[in-house]
Amino acid sequence: MTRISWAAALVALVVSLHPAPTRAFELSASAAYWTENSSAFTVTLGKLFDLPGFQLGPRVGFAYVTSPNSVGVPADLVAHLAIGTFYIEGQAGAWFLFSRDPVVRFHATGGGGLDLGVVKVGVEAGYLHNGGLFGARVSFSL
C-alpha cells in the first residue's frame, strides 16, 4: 500500500508542475540508436522564440556517431508545443558528418516528454539519411 501512495504522490507532483517561461537558451544532450548500425550522440544549443500557440527556433551543436567514428554538426529548426507538464517537439534540418559520404544528411525527428521547468526529459524517433533514429533527450533552460 505504501508503494502505491508514493507512486500516486509522485504522479501528482509531476502533473501539478507547470512549465517555466521561455528562457534565453536551451542546452540539450541526446543519445540515439541509428539503424545504420551506429549510435548517435549530440550536444546542442538552441533558442526558441514564442509564437502564438507554440515555439520555434534553431538548434545547432556537436554530433558524434559510431561505427565508423565520425564527428559533425547538427543544424535543425525546432518546433515545440507545450501541453501543461508535457511537450511535443519536432525538428528537421541538416547534419554535417565530416568523415562519411554523403557529408550532408537530411535529419527529421519528433518526440515528446515531460517539461519540469528548467529541465525537459523526453524520447524521440525519426530519420537520419539512410536509417531510423530512436533515442532520448534531456534539455536544460539557461
Feature locations, PLM:
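Cleavable N-terminal export/targeting peptides
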Residues: 1-26
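Outer-membrane beta-barrel proteins
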Residues: 45-53, 78-85, 116-118, 140-142
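Residues that define the transmembrane beta-barrel architecture of outer-membrane proteins
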Residues: 37-43, 54, 69-75, 86, ...
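Short glycine-rich beta-strand segments
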Residues: 30-34, 61-65, 80-82, 91-99, ...
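Short polar/acidic secondary-structure junctions
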Residues: 34, 48-50, 82, 127-130
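Short glycine/proline- and aromatic-enriched beta-strand/turn motifs that initiate or cap beta-hairpins
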Residues: 20-72
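Membrane-embedded beta-strand positions of outer-membrane beta-barrel proteins
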Residues: 27-31, 58-60, 75, 88-92, ...
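Outer-membrane beta-barrel "beta-signal"
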Residues: 28, 112-117, 131-142
